[in-house]
């Protein structure tokens, strides 16, 4: 999902802006001056992170852009180090997933259940860290990015780089389920608290 697609769901986007601390208006689905002001603050923080940590490949940039600016900083800091490490290992690394709206999450949840296909998630809309602009997943590829490695011992190697970033959790430290490609900003102690806060706006 791109940031443009997220913005089309105006109420969801307003909640994202409010969660980031920029939007002080009502969640009404109407783009007004308060939302415009919040979007400017979002873009300013986004630009600052790019200046500090640099920019990357198109796919990673597309997914980073969907995260809260504070999470974008984490993603950029981690990816800068991860790309250097991946290169030494003879691989390429990219961020392949960022924020999902509740609607997109529900569609993924339906796959392998009410819709054809293999199951890809156990979380409905509002029950995934990806629904709040806080989490991203990365993928490991061949140097030319023509081959994707869904399984590799290097997920652990690269994922561990996130452990040293303050207020960050790497899914490889989880017990059930272990999620080595997953990294998130620790804004809330549980996904329940994240959902409750997000929905309360």
Model-derived regions: residue spans:
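Catalytic cores and adjacent binding grooves of peptidoglycan-active enzymes
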Residues: 119, 123-201
